[in-house]
């Protein structure tokens, strides 16, 4: 069990006082925004898909900060301590295949979220067309959309997840050992991932090779035991999907040591984040981030001891930047 006592305590306290993605937090709304954004990446196309937005109390969600530091950094970005947090997934068109990175929430978090299928339809695609789904990790805002009730939502897709992640969350013995507040992640895996496994549509991978030409999983551990990034590369252009290693650009870019109550191993998550940010800033490739303001695509630029977020420049054609 890698959780430090400190992490377990902070998780327990946070879940008792506040569950940021609780149904009661959501206000009824439909997805009034278009919910998709196209961009070309070499011969590939990336289409950001919005699952919706939901209020998040970042001053309670973010931990390992000095007193008042989170509020101060949010204020500098004209953000309140409770912000509308995006839940993004990404459709990659690569070599004739339609590959989804994460699957949104489905009906798990109420009407403000659960719009991936709607966004996919608006972008011109149907769930039956999806060939593969690459999961960054097994949390409900990333795997919820795999199932609609007891039906597989993307019936023709093979689902990919790191072996470490699947082995951890699909093992009841690990649930028995986990702190009470973390047991629901195992329940989520049983509800959303086990049926995919039973249907013979789950593929697990080790790191070190491509899943498809130009598409490579990269170890990004800490937020969960087997959390994965995905690198896509075409014609010299690259984008790295960072999952949940970065939750708030306003707070965790200037101070990458600040962690999240949802981190399985907060220390490891901080180390992974610092390495990923340094590499992205040095190499200058694109990044896609699940909870940065939609479409969550941009660049990371070094700024003093930290970094700043440079969002993608809007392009009506999706072919210019
Ligand atoms: Zn997430």
Where are these regions (language model features)?
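Cap/insert and terminal regions of metallo-dependent hydrolase folds
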Residues: 231, 235-321
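Bacterial N-terminal signal peptides
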Residues: 8-18
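Short, conserved loop/helix-junction motifs that constitute active-site signature segments
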Residues: 150-156
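Bacterial N-terminal signal peptides that target proteins for export
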Residues: 1-9
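Active-site metal-binding loops of divalent metal-dependent hydrolases
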Residues: 51-52, 103-106, 138, 164-165, ...
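Metallo-beta-lactamase
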Residues: 19-117, 121-125, 129-143, 163-219, 236-243, ...
């Amino acid at each position: 069990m890698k959780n430090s006592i400190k992490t377990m305590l902070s998780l327990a306290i946070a879940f008792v006082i506040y569950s940021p993605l609780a149904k009661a937090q959501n206000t009824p709304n439909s997805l009034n925004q278009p919910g998709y954004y196209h961009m070309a990446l070499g011969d590939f196309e990336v289409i950001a898909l919005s699952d919706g937005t939901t209020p998040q109390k970042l001053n309670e969600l973010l931990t390992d900060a000095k007193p008042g530091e989170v509020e101060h950094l949010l204020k500098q970005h004209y953000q309140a301590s409770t912000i509308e947090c995006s839940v993004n997934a990404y459709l990659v068109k690569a070599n004739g295949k339609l590959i989804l990175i994460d699957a949104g929430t489905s009906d798990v978090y109420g009407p403000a979220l659960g719009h991936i299928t709607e966004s996919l339809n608006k972008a011109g695609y149907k769930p039956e067309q999806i060939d593969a789904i690459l999961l960054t990790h097994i949390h409900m805002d990333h795997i919820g959309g795999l199932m609609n009730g007891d039906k597989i939502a993307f019936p023709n897709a093979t689902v990919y997840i790191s072996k470490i992640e699947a082995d951890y969350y699909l093992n009841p013995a690990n649930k028995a050992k986990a702190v009470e507040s973390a047991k629901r992640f195992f329940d989520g895996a049983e509800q959303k991932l086990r049926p995919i496994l039973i249907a013979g549509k789950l593929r697990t991978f080790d790191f070190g090779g491509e899943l498809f030409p130009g598409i490579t999983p990269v170890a990004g551990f800490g937020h969960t035991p087997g959390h994965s990034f995905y690198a896509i590369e075409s014609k010299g252009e690259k984008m790295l999907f960072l999952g949940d290693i970065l939750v708030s650009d306003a707070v965790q870019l200037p101070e990458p040591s600040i962690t999240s109550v949802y981190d399985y191993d907060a220390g490891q998550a901080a180390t992974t984040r610092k390495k990923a940010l340094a590499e992205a800033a040095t190499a200058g490739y694109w990044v896609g981030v699940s909870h940065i303001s939609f479409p969550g695509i941009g660049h990371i630029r070094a700024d003093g001891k930290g970094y700043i977020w440079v969002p993608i420049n809007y392009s009506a054609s999706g072919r210019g930047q």
